[in-house]
Design a protein with these regions (language model features):
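Acidic, glycine-enriched catalytic cores built around paired aspartates
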Residues: 1-153
Length: 153
């Protein structure tokens, strides 16, 4: 028996009806894209700080404490970079983190895909708790993902 969080895709519909929040989010704008994820533009202190913050939530009884992490492709160029990512994932699990997922795509690539969808039919992104072909998403969801990727690690 556990406690569930918000729906993994409620950030769009929910955000449209939720007022402004103390973290600076404006009324009517998209909510955070995961129950343990920082709000858009708030993940400014690096991945370690983000994981430590998310791990402060007691996830032992929660079935849906999703943490979305946005990474720029340049942050995973070498074998050493991949080892560091593996260490981050292990550290998050050791702190009690249950569900972490990644978007590894550059903002410029997403904007290019919006202009020339025929060139990017194979571009897959994490939306929330699911993956989708970017060019198959509606414009509002695409724009939200573009905004999320403006601040990536």
């Amino acid at each position: 028996r556990g406690i569930g969080g918000a729906s993994i895709s409620s950030m769009f519909a929910g955000g449209a009806i939720v007022g402004a929040t103390p973290d600076g989010r404006h009324a009517g704008t998209t909510l955070a894209d995961g129950t343990a994820s920082p709000a858009q533009g708030r993940d400014t202190h690096g991945p370690t700080a983000m994981l430590r913050s998310a791990a402060k939530i007691d996830q032992s009884m929660c079935a849906s404490t999703l943490l979305n992490v946005k990474l720029h492709p340049s942050s995973l160029r070498s074998r050493e970079d991949l080892k560091k990512l593996g260490s981050l994932i292990k550290a998050y699990a050791a702190m009690g983190g249950k569900w972490i997922q990644f978007n590894v795509v550059g903002n410029s690539q997403l904007l290019e895909a919006q202009k020339f969808p025929e060139r990017y039919r194979d571009l897959i992104v994490r939306v929330a708790g699911y993956s989708a072909y970017f060019v198959d998403l509606n414009k509002g969801v695409q724009d939200d993902i573009v905004r999320r990727m403006e601040v990536s690690i």
